[in-house]
A protein has these predicted regions:
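Sequence-specific dsDNA recognition surfaces
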Residues: 30-80, 100, 104-105, 233, ...
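Alpha-helix initiation and N-capping motif
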Residues: 26, 44, 119, 128, ...
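C-terminal, helix-dominated tail/subdomain
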Residues: 204, 211-220
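A short beta-sheet element
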Residues: 80-132, 136-140, 144-152
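Active-site lining segments that contact anionic ligands and/or coordinate catalytic metals
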Residues: 105-106, 152-154, 189, 199
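Short, well-ordered beta-strand elements within core beta-sheets of diverse protein domains
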Residues: 109-113, 153-158, 170-177
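Extended hydrophobic-aromatic, low-complexity segments
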Residues: 95, 120-121, 133-135, 162-166, ...
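Non-catalytic DNA-recognition/assembly elements of restriction-modification systems
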Residues: 1-42, 56-59, 163-164, 170-205, ...
Length: 242
């Protein structure tokens, strides 16, 4: 499980680096994206796809399943490829690239790229520490600061990223989504099997380790593919030999 978390951390750093090294004309990100304001009644929220500030994980670790749904009011609608950020205590750096459609708390901001092809690039921009530091400069409140929506949209980034940057951030973000889903499957499997192992209900002596070895070979193949992605992602900036 930790392998996928660590791997995604590296991939996200690559995305950040790509966005940061764009040297074109800078513009406020309000030219690249908008904040979603679409709302629906809370009874339309589904637990599997509902995102709260609590379900978003600190230090840019994506999200986990929400523990409950709101009982009153409205929720914000998000779509696949939107970027969700908790607006409570921005210094916790809670951010997630949506891989599905769903709803979220009003304290979760939904950024949507005006050009869908730039959604991974937008995620790379918003994922940077410098963005969260910028948001904190405009935050209001002491015990529980909230970011200023207008202020954060004035954060600047390159307005017209190169095609290779768009392609690379897209490849990397797609792999991040795949890894997240694989990690979710393994987590669910662990939660089911571990109690059975502890109770002795499952006898490990009867496990077919040839299947396990086959799975490991597939993981090695996936790692080989990723080793090809890295030099593509950072042409001229990164070398696997460094």
């Amino acid at each position: 499980l930790q392998l996928y978390v660590s791997l995604n951390g590296y991939l996200e750093e690559l995305c950040e680096c790509l966005a940061a090294h764009e040297s074109g004309t800078k513009t406020e990100i309000m030219q690249l994206c908008s904040l979603v304001s679409e709302k629906v009644p809370c009874n339309e929220a589904v637990l599997n796809t509902y995102v709260s500030t609590e379900s978003l994980l600190s230090d840019k670790r994506g999200r986990q399943r929400a523990s409950s749904l709101p009982r009153t009011g409205k929720v914000t609608v998000y779509r696949s490829s939107d970027v969700l950020i908790s607006n409570i205590r921005p210094y916790f750096k809670k951010i997630w690239f949506a891989d599905c459609d769903g709803t979220c708390s009003g304290d979760v901001l939904v950024f949507r790229a005006k050009n869908p092809l730039l959604a991974p690039y937008l995620y790379s921009i918003l994922h940077a520490d410098s963005f969260f530091e910028f948001v904190m400069k405009g935050a209001k409140g002491t015990k529980m600061p909230r970011g200023d929506k207008r202020q954060m949209l004035t954060y600047q980034a390159a307005s017209s990223p190169r095609q290779d940057t768009i392609a690379s951030t897209t490849i990397l973000t797609e792999q991040i989504v795949i890894n997240d889903r694989e990690n979710d499957k393994l987590t669910a499997l662990r939660d089911v099997i571990l109690p059975k192992l502890m109770s002795g209900e499952i006898d490990v002596s009867k496990i077919d380790f040839t299947q396990l070895n086959s799975h490991l070979e597939k993981r090695k193949a996936a790692a080989s593919v990723l080793s090809l992605i890295f030099p593509i992602a950072l042409p001229g900036l990164w070398s696997p030999m460094q």
